[in-house]
Amino acid sequence: MINASLKELSLALAAKKVSSVELSSLFLDRIERLNPTLNAFVTVDREKSLQMARDADARIAAGTAGPLTGIPIAQKDIFCAEGWLSTCGSKMLANFVSPYDATVIRKMHAEAGLVSLGKTNMDEFAMGSSNETSFFGSVRNPWDTQRVPGGSSGGSAAAVAARLAPAATGTDTGGSIRQPAALCNLTGLKPTYGVVSRYGMIAFASSLDQGGPMAASAEDCALLLNTMVGFDERDSTSLERPVEDYARDLDKPLDGLRIGLPKEFFGEGCDAEVMAAVRAAIAEYEKLGATCVEISLPNSHLSVPAYYVIAPAEASSNLSRFDGVRYGYRAPEYGNLDDMYMKTRAQGFGAEVKRRILIGAYVLSHGYYDAYYLQAQRIRRLIANDFVEAFKHCDVIMSPTSPSTAFKLGEKAADPVQMYLSDIYTIAVNLAGLPGMSIPCGFVGGLPVGLQLIGNYFAENRLLNVAHRYQQATDWHQRRPGGIE
């Protein structure tokens, strides 16, 4: 049961071969045993989870269950969940118990009947590429516990890779689902911006943030995505579109598929062995009936600098609400209101968050707004236009997800620029608002390599189909880390 797919678990629950309580207990026991090594979860509430499992069993017995009712999953601790600690990996919210459910949580609990096993560790306020900025300590990669799992959804990635949960939620602002998926041998999907509600998802950069699924396979991601999507009037950026069944087209053949290979993503800057694994995966696609065309994304080299103006600018605004007045951490000693603000924020935020708040405040300040922020927004439009032009010549774009395999804990902690370049292939997708995936495509030195798939707007079905057909022809996604038991 530990390695079963969501579809297999669904069939087992429906056939009464196992109960949700038994299944949830199995994973909760595994979390209790292995989480001290991995630090993937920051909050586990066994009784809450088992009560949800009992409710799910009642729905199954009554014949009112959905496809995933009773299946336990992990929730990234960026989603508010009523009655649960919702920390966002920060001292600022270390004791914050949410009074309400995020829309994604409500849809999963109340509508789909999924069971939450707990809240997973993450980079503080989702700011990081290695899960080393969390107030609750670094997460360790199950493939090598001396290495990072990627970030910011590193806790979710480590939890699923080590089978502490069969699937998990993540969020992606510049690569935070795809990069950990690549480093932990998972399938991760960032949907088109606006497809998944951001209500109750603690904001980092509101024009970039998007929630999505992380699991072993494309099929599992499709099933989980079905429970997450839908218009939400409480999110002003939510898109009102017909709800799709993302598992519908998984088995379609790939004959005639046109794969775009951006020349800018296949030059220097990527580890040679990682690139070899990516090229081998593309060759496998050609065997499945696809053809490759060279395309250009001429402004993609500007994506990292543009992102590190826009995202910190939005973060400096979003994080101004954390001031110690109504909720969250408050400095124990202060002289007056201004002193309370300063001490609370100085003590409550970690170094990387403070760095990005300072950058954001600077680029939005009088005299620098036009030179930095407006210029970054112009570049963002050019990057989006490049993708529009590219998709006239191809159906899906492929590239490495990350320029390297998982690096050692602490290796890049003192060099923010090197850390930021970990997301060099993923950031442009967020700036354009496109859907993107990472799927396992090989190993280098025993560490996983991810292949990035980028689709046109609302092409999640096509991406999942392309990923699924590759996973039917290969077994990379079925490999599990050893040595963590």
From Swiss-Prot:
Keyword annotations of the record: ATP-binding, Ligase, Nucleotide-binding, Protein biosynthesis
InterPro entries recorded: Amidase, Amidase_CS, Amidase_dom, AS_sf, GatA
Gene Ontology molecular function terms on file: ATP binding; glutaminyl-tRNA synthase (glutamine-hydrolyzing) activity
Domain of life (superkingdom): Bacteria
GO annotation, biological process: translation
Cellular component per GO, a single term: glutamyl-tRNA(Gln) amidotransferase complex
Any one Pfam family match given in the protein's UniProt record, by short name: Amidase
Enzyme class of the recorded protein, top EC level: ligase
Active-site feature positions: 76, 152, 176
EC number(s) reported in the record: 6.3.5.7
Catalysed transformations (reactions): L-glutamyl-tRNA(Gln) + L-glutamine + ATP + H2O = L-glutaminyl-tRNA(Gln) + L-glutamate + ADP + phosphate + H(+)
Complex and partners: Heterotrimer of A, B and C subunits.
Described purpose of this protein according to its UniProt entry: Allows the formation of correctly charged Gln-tRNA(Gln) through the transamidation of misacylated Glu-tRNA(Gln) in organisms which lack glutaminyl-tRNA synthetase. The reaction takes place in the presence of glutamine and ATP through an activated gamma-phospho-Glu-tRNA(Gln).
Family: Belongs to the amidase family. GatA subfamily.
Name of this protein: Glutamyl-tRNA(Gln) amidotransferase subunit A
Organism: Dechloromonas aromatica (strain RCB)
